A protein has these predicted regions:
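Core subunits and conserved enzymes of cellular information-processing
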Residues: 2-230
Length: 230
């Protein structure tokens, strides 16, 4: 069936979906901030950013952005779609985490209970952020595209368990870089996969089933919409 969407409707649709994705990504950044402030060892991805920022004169957020664009290259090789959501993810999570860190609202935890609770809250929040921004179907972020791409190669394995293996591999690199590794880091490797399965299961969400729009599809839709007028 021919697309009759006008260009103004196309813009409103993509802007609305982009705004929805941005909200989800800021929720994700908040979860990353919680994990840092848990002071219990970070998630492997955060630990990787921290390790790079420790070895080079760049901020945590900048390191996060650099890593994101490197992974985008890997995603392209895996033929995962790269779209508006991918670019937003690469920029907003790192920048958003820096914003929350600069605000300093949540103090670093010093007790075992405090560390554990804040870490678990951070993991749950990041899962919710993943769900929200991925539902916009504007393509996954670099890390999530990598996760989904690997998950498609093992369709019978729950995505959380695929994530667990991926995080374990990232943690090996973190160890080499001298990133801080604590009990919380180990909990993140195994806990993130488990919590992902629980949260996504509760929301009845399967990221591998989503049909994402890549940049070529977005441009094609824009071109078609222009033909239909404003």
């Amino acid at each position: 069936m021919k697309n009759t969407e006008t260009f103004s409707k196309f813009l409103l649709n993509r802007l609305g979906r982009s705004a929805f994705a941005i909200v989800g990504l800021m929720v994700f950044a908040l979860g990353s901030y919680f994990q840092i402030q848990a002071n219990f060892g970070m998630s492997p991805w955060n630990s990787l950013s921290q390790g790079i920022s420790m070895n080079y004169p760049i901020t945590f957020g900048t390191a996060n952005i650099i890593i994101s664009f490197i992974i985008i290259g890997i995603d392209i090789l895996m033929r995962e779609p790269i779209g508006i959501g991918t670019i937003l993810n690469a920029i907003i999570i790192g920048a958003g985490t820096d914003v929350f860190l600069s605000m300093g609202v949540l103090p670093q935890q010093t007790t075992f209970i405090g560390k554990f609770v804040v870490l678990m809250a951070g993991i749950v929040i990041t899962c919710l952020g993943q769900y929200l921004y991925m539902k916009a179907c504007l393509s996954c972020g670099p890390r999530d595209s990598l996760l989904v791409g690997l998950g498609k190669k093992f369709p019978k394995v729950k995505i959380g368990y695929v994530n667990m293996v991926l995080l374990a591999m990232v943690q090996v690199v973190c160890f080499i870089l001298g990133s801080p590794v604590g009990l919380g880091t180990v909990i993140c490797v195994f806990g993130t996969g488990t919590i992902t399965n629980i949260v996504f299961g509760f929301l009845k969400f399967e990221p591998r089933a989503l049909k994402h729009e890549g940049i070529p599809e977005t441009l094609a839709a824009a071109k078609e919409a222009l033909k239909n007028g404003f």
